Design a protein with these regions (language model features):
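A short, Lys/Arg-rich alpha-helix, primarily the initiator
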Residues: 2-29
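Short alpha-helical elements of helix-turn-helix
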Residues: 20, 46, 61-64
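Generic non-transmembrane alpha-helical segments
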Residues: 21, 25, 39-40, 70-73
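Short, conserved catalytic or interaction motifs in soluble domains
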Residues: 54
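DNA major-groove recognition helix of helix-turn-helix/homeodomain DNA-binding modules
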Residues: 62-77
Length: 78
C-alpha cells in the first residue's frame, strides 16, 4: 500500500470514529438530525450531519468546535 493510500484509510477511519461519536452524543441528547438542523438555524443541515455520522464526510475543526459547543461537550469528547 502506498503512503497516500494509508493516509486515505487513516482519514476514513478517523471520519468514521468521529461520526460514530457524533451520533452517540446526538442520540444521548435525544435529538434527531432534523432537530439539530432546526436548533442551529440550519448551520448543520440534516443531510450533512448524516454524512458526518456515517463517516462519509470529514468535518473541519472549526465546525467540530461549533458542534461540540452546541452539544455542550468538549472537542476531546468527540
Amino acid at each position: 500500500m502506498s503512503t497516500s493510500e494509508n493516509e486515505s484509510l487513516d482519514e476514513l477511519s478517523y471520519a468514521r470514529l468521529v461520526g460514530e461519536r457524533l451520533r452517540q452524543i446526538r442520540q444521548q441528547k435525544k435529538l434527531s438530525l432534523s432537530d439539530v438542523e432546526s436548533a442551529t438555524n440550519q448551520e448543520f443541515k440534516a443531510s450533512v450531519m448524516g454524512a458526518y455520522e456515517r463517516g462519509e464526510r470529514m468535518i473541519s475543526v472549526p465546525r467540530l468546535e461549533r458542534l461540540a459547543n452546541f452539544y455542550g461537550v468538549t472537542v476531546d469528547q468527540l
